[in-house]
Regions:
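Phosphopantetheine-dependent thiolation modules in NRPS/PKS and related acyl-activating systems
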Residues: 2-35, 43-45, 49-78
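Two-component histidine kinase catalytic core, primarily the HATPase_c
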Residues: 39
């Protein structure tokens, strides 16, 4: 596994533990209603704690479109 796959895997586990459903890297989280505002905050806080990054509130919806988009943001912040 390369570092990007590991990142997708770790973020995927965080998302799945909060939404209690299996998600793929490109599963549309917000558009499908899988993630609502409360779970978006939970995911954001968990990702920030796990990876030591900060996701500005106005950008949460943009970066929580999918596991892949969230992983890309986290990777860019490292």
């Amino acid at each position: 596994m390369d570092s990007q796959e590991v990142l997708h895997d770790r973020i995927g586990h965080i998302v799945e533990s909060i939404v209690l459903k299996k998600v793929g890297p490109d599963t549309q989280l917000i558009a499908t209603g899988l993630v609502d505002s409360l779970s978006a905050v939970d995911i954001t806080l968990a990702v920030e704690a796990e990876f030591g990054c900060s996701i500005p509130a106005p950008e949460i919806a943009e970066h929580l479109q999918s596991v892949r988009s969230l992983a890309a943001y986290v990777a860019a912040q490292r």
